[in-house]
Regions:
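Membrane-proximal soluble regions of multi-pass membrane proteins
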Residues: 20-75
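Structural signal for membrane-spanning alpha-helices in multi-pass inner-membrane proteins
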Residues: 25, 87-91, 110-117, 135-142, ...
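Interhelical loop and helix-boundary elements at the membrane-water interface
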Residues: 30-31, 65-76, 115-129, 166-178, ...
Length: 239
């Protein structure tokens, strides 16, 4: 029964990942999340049910639009598969229903923010601020850490990034501060320190590899959000 539920969560994650793709594409552009329906951004072709199957339709169509032949962005199957695997992994590591629900919500926020930052270089207030609020709410109703730890974690996360911004005169932004505040609100101050340290390591290594592969200039801005999100997921699952 446990395996069946895990498989169900994986499938749910695939479906939710499909919705997250809509948010990732439309929210930064100021578009409605409801209208118009899913369509090819190149030719406007409205997608049919068979073209909306998570991961499967991408493979079936060989990564191209059936109408115009335009390449479908790799992000679509990546987000769907990542969310499916993530949902199943969170169930595997959760010891209670409340921990599972909180984990799924937190992971969902991280996925959306990471890919928006990766593509657009922003971390929208429409997601970060409600994310902080949800972290506080779960603490208040007793589903996670004590309220004082949630509040302290959010303040520490926000304050650390703001301090770095002021001292370095750039390099990070207020969106990064709010994302780390989300981490603190959900997981507490210890998670903030862990995530900031390992995100810095991951961001440095990843940044060097990115510049080497793309041959871009060292002044090219590299989003920090994905590194923080990755470190936060590791903390959520294993610590």
């Amino acid at each position: 029964m446990e395996v069946v539920f895990r498989v169900w969560l994986f499938c749910l994650g695939l479906v939710m990942g499909s919705f997250f793709n809509v948010v990732i594409y439309r929210l930064p552009r100021g578009m409605s999340l409801v209208k118009p329906g899913s369509h090819c951004p190149q030719c406007g072709h409205s997608l049919r049910a068979a073209e909306l199957i998570p991961v499967g339709s991408y493979l079936w169509q060989r990564g191209t639009c059936r109408s115009c032949g335009a390449r479908i962005h790799w992000r679509y199957p990546a987000v769907e598969l990542l969310t499916g695997v993530g949902f199943a992994a969170i169930e595997w590591t959760s010891s209670s229903w409340t921990q599972l629900i909180v984990g799924l919500v937190f992971f969902s926020i991280l996925v959306v923010l990471a890919f928006i930052d990766l593509e657009h270089g922003i971390l929208p207030n429409k997601i970060t601020i409600p994310g902080i609020g949800l972290g506080f709410l779960f603490a208040i109703i007793g589903w996670t850490i004590p309220v004082i730890e949630s509040l302290g974690g959010a303040v520490l996360g926000f304050g650390l990034i703001v301090s770095i911004v002021l001292l370095s005169r750039g390099g990070m932004g207020m969106g990064d501060a709010k994302l780390l505040a989300v981490v603190g609100a959900f997981l507490g101050w210890q998670a903030v320190l862990y995530v900031l340290f390992w995100a810095s390591v991951l961001g440095s290594v990843g940044g060097i590899l990115y510049l080497y592969v793309t041959k871009k200039d060292r002044k090219t801005p590299i989003p920090f959000g994905p590194s923080m999100a990755a470190a936060a997921v590791v903390y959520l699952l294993f610590l």
